[in-house]
Amino acid sequence: LRLKSIVSYAKKVL
């Protein structure tokens, strides 16, 4: 799990 991937996903969700 990559931190950048999580951040990008969070931006899409929010």
UniProtKB/Swiss-Prot annotation:
Cellular component GO terms held in the UniProt record? extracellular region; membrane; other organism cell membrane
Report the record's Gene Ontology biological process terms: defense response to bacterium; defense response to fungus; innate immune response; killing of cells of another organism
Compartment(s) where it occurs, according to its Swiss-Prot or TrEMBL record: Secreted; Target cell membrane
What is this protein's tissue specificity according to the annotation? May be secreted in hemolymph.
Q: Which UniProt keywords apply?
A: Amidation, Antibiotic, Antimicrobial, Fungicide, Immunity, Innate immunity, Membrane, Secreted, Target cell membrane, Target membrane
Task: State where it is primarily located.
Answer: secreted
Additional note from the record: Is the only mastoparan described so far that does not belong to the order of Hymenoptera.
Give the protein name, as stated in the record.
Mastoparan-S
Species whose genome carries this gene: Sphodromantis viridis
Tell me the organism's taxonomic lineage. Eukaryota, Metazoa, Ecdysozoa, Arthropoda, Hexapoda
